[in-house]
């Protein structure tokens, strides 16, 4: 099957934004204008095409990044047909894992900002993730029709808060109720969209006289940004020559792809203005798969051996599985991005991470929650596969004859956990299946059984995250469950070095005895270093074959520390000495000796409890600033700064222990009459004050 769209005309883009910047509405309009959707879905009615899980429709927030394919020939039909693969990403902090995961497979992104709210806390998180993966991006200022809308204030915030380098390629005509359209700085014409056709038709008009000076000033800035792309253009510009439209577009495109600038546009998706021009900007400025460096990977058996794959149909096949979803009709769907080569349904692919070959069953092209079966996928495509049993998020799929491991994604450790128990015996079995399915879909969600209580414990990135997963368990799997109170994921570590601590396991009870003896030194590591074991045994005082047993004994003890039974982190153990018995020594005895030595060393090394600290940002009207700050301080929070919001009001940034943040949304609502909002994400672990540590230990019954 021949390629319908040349790869140069592919655009793999993400639409991402803070909650309520209108991202889902913007995506809906894109689907409408590109002719896929014939009736626009409104988030207000719970009918938006991209928000396809029931909870999303009820809550009006986007949870799952649905992947959609659409086609665009330009708003005036003046471009050859381009193929957009659009990934809708969630804007809520509890779902940053989804955003991070989609950034990994995108070539470019459209960042949507609210013209009133401006750069909000989550926008900064998303921006950091886009920087991490080097994703070129456009900025689209939405909701220009709302009271308090201010395009130029958002421009200033992009520069100051995100350290971005925005280059407006349009400026608004009017704002709030008077927002009529935009001045296109490339054409130096006003664009006015026709309301009757929902913005499908438009016309170019002369720039309104009162805007001419503003348009001239911003065009000059845009041309100057373009001229900085190369010395030749700069000479031409400084010599007073006009740059052609094509030169400006190419120069801005080159600088956007190099992540030096971000073209900036505006509109109101809800009123059908401006999104069409943004789609043209996606063609003009964002990269195709061949405009960015080839994807990098490593050899399956040698991490030092670097490999790469070009975005070309004739290369060996390589793809990355970036999302797993359970679909009520076809079962498990694996979304994957093809970086190189091509593959047909029925072909065998190799998963080097799991070291398994699998047959690719059906391949589906997704449009939000509708699907079309296709036979072949090519370089640059994003599709979903049915029938891959072993693949999980972040796995590579490749040609069995040419293995490559594309980089692994690193997922954050969960910070909050809850006990969950089925309401009836019938729910028991279903709950196990449901939790395993959900954990396969979402690497930031973990399930385990508590050995002491026998309870099932679920852990995730925040209260909303777990709430939604429990909700899905009920809807998709019919499991009724009771949820315990949220528990904080504390950790334990040490502050001092404990030298030459011994563990001796001796058992003589008729017949063959047991004998293991290990001496260790335990010392703290810097935060985040994890556990390290060093074998410093000299002269064979412990035989080689027993040393792994000592390490295993220690590793098995790490999940339950001595203070309150929380996992021990960031410690280094050096095995320095020991002894053995020719007859009675065995692996089990040395495992016990290692465990005993470690527990004893922990007691001597000033053990402390660590608690998760959260970066909290509260957006509040100015009148409540004092109240909010006072409340954060009473929660042991440290206020770290304050910013102004575009439409008035303040953003308060603070670091607060997670244990103090339960029920915060209700408290904040009542303290500010529902006018303040907040976001929170995990920052780092810090030592808990003595009184808090004692309270936690008492609650755990381990004083």
Curated annotation (Swiss-Prot):
Gene3D superfamilies: 3.30.230.10, 3.30.70.240, Elongation Factor G (Translational Gtpase), domain 3 (3.30.70.870), P-loop containing nucleotide triphosphate hydrolases (3.40.50.300), Translation factors (2.40.30.10). Residues 8-290 form the tr-type G domain. GTP binds at residues 17-24, 88-92, 142-145. Keywords: Cytoplasm, Elongation factor, GTP-binding, Nucleotide-binding, Protein biosynthesis. SUPFAM superfamilies: EF-G C-terminal domain-like, P-loop containing nucleoside triphosphate hydrolases, Ribosomal protein S5 domain 2-like, Translation proteins. The keyword GTP-binding applies. One of its GO terms (biological process) is ribosome disassembly. Coiled coil: none annotated. It comes from the Bacteria. SMART domains: EFG_C, EFG_IV. GO terms for cellular component: cytoplasm. GO terms for molecular function: GTP binding; GTPase activity; guanosine tetraphosphate binding; translation elongation factor activity. Its main location: cytoplasm. It is found in: Cytoplasm. The keyword Cytoplasm applies. Belongs to the TRAFAC class translation factor GTPase superfamily. Classic translation factor GTPase family. EF-G/EF-2 subfamily. Catalyzes the GTP-dependent ribosomal translocation step during translation elongation. During this step, the ribosome changes from the pre-translocational (PRE) to the post-translocational (POST) state as the newly formed A-site-bound peptidyl-tRNA and P-site-bound deacylated tRNA move to the P and E sites, respectively. Catalyzes the coordinated movement of the two tRNA molecules, the mRNA and conformational changes in the ribosome. HAMAP family: EF_G_EF_2_B. This is Elongation factor G 1. It comes from Cupriavidus metallidurans (strain ATCC 43123 / DSM 2839 / NBRC 102507 / CH34) (Ralstonia metallidurans). The lineage of its organism: Bacteria, Pseudomonadati, Pseudomonadota, Betaproteobacteria, Burkholderiales. The gene is fusA1.
């Amino acid at each position: 099957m021949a390629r319908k769209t040349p790869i140069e005309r592919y655009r793999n883009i993400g639409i991402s934004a803070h909650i309520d910047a209108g991202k889902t509405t913007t995506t809906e309009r894109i689907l409408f204008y590109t002719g896929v959707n014939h009736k626009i879905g409104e988030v207000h009615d719970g009918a938006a095409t991209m928000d396809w899980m029931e909870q999303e429709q009820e809550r009006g927030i986007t949870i799952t990044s649905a992947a959609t394919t659409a086609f665009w020939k330009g708003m005036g039909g003046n471009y050859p047909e381009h193929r957009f693969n659009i990934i809708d990403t969630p804007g809520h902090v509890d779902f940053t894992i989804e955003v991070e995961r989609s950034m990994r497979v995108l070539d470019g992104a459209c960042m949507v900002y609210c013209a009133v709210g401006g750069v909000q806390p989550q926008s900064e998180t998303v921006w950091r993730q886009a920087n991490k993966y080097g994703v070129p991006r456009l900025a689209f200022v939405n909701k220009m029709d709302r009271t308090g809308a201010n395009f130029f204030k958002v421009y200033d915030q992009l520069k100051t808060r995100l350290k971005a380098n925005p280059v407006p390629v349009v400026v608004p005509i009017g704002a709030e109720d008077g927002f009529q359209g935009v001045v296109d700085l490339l054409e130096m014409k006003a664009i006015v969209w026709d309301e009757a056709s929902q913005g499908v038709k438009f016309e170019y008009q002369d720039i309104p006289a009162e805007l001419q000076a503003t348009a001239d000033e911003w065009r000059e800035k845009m041309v100057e940004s373009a001229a900085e792309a190369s010395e030749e253009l700069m000479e031409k510009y400084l010599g007073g020559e006009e740059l052609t439209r094509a030169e400006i577009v190419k120069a801005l495109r080159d600088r956007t792809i190099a992540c030096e600038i971000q073209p900036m546009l505006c509109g109101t998706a809800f009123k059908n203005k401006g999104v069409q021009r943004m789609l043209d900007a996606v063609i003009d400025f964002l990269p195709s798969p061949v405009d960015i460096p080839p994807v990098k990977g490593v050899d399956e058996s040698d991490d030092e051996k670097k490999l790469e794959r070009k975005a070309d149909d004739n290369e060996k096949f390589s793809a990355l599985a970036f999302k797993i979803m359970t679909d009520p009709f076809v079962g498990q769907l694996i979304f994957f991005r093809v970086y190189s080569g091509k593959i047909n349904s029925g072909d065998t692919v190799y998963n080097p991470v799991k070291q398994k070959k699998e047959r690719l069953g059906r391949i589906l092209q997704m449009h939000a929650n509708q699907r079309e079966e296709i036979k072949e996928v090519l370089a640059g495509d994003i599709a979903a596969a049915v029938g891959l049993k072993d693949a999980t998020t972040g796995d590579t799929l490749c040609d069995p004859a040419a293995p490559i491991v594309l980089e692994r994604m690193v997922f954050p450790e969960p910070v909050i956990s809850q006990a969950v128990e089925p309401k009836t015996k019938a729910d028991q079995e279903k709950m196990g299946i449901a939790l395993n399915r959900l954990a396969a879909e979402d690497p930031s969600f973990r399930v385990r059984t508590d050995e002491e209580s026998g309870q099932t414990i679920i852990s995730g990135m925040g209260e909303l995250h777990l709430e939604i997963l429990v909700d899905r368990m009920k809807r998709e799997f019919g499991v009724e469950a009771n949820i315990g109170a949220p528990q904080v994921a504390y950790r334990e570590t040490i502050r001092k070095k404990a030298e030459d601590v011994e563990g001796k396991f001796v058992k003589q009870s008729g017949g063959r005895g047991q004998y293991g003896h290990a001496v260790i030194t335990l010392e703290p590591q810097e935060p985040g270093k994890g556990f390290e074991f060093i074998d410093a045994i000299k002269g064979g005082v412990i035989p080689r074959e027993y040393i792994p047993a000592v390490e295993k004994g220690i590793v098995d003890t790490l999940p339950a520390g001595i203070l309150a039974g929380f996992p021990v982190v960031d410690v280094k153990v050096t095995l320095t000495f020991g002894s053995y018995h020719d007859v009675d020594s065995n692996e089990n005895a040395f495992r016990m000796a290692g465990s005993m030595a470690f527990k004893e060393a922990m007691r001597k090394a000033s053990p402390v409890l660590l608690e998760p600290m959260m970066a909290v940002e509260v957006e509040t009207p100015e009148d409540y600033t004092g109240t909010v700050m006072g409340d954060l301080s009473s929660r042991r929070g440290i206020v770290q700064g304050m910013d102004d919001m575009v439409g008035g009001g303040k953003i308060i940034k603070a670091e607060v222990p997670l244990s103090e943040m339960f029920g915060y949304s209700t408290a904040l609502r009542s303290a500010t009459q529902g006018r303040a909002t907040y976001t929170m994400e995990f920052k780092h672990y810090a030592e808990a004050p003595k009184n808090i540590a004692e309270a936690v230990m008492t609650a755990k019954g381990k004083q």
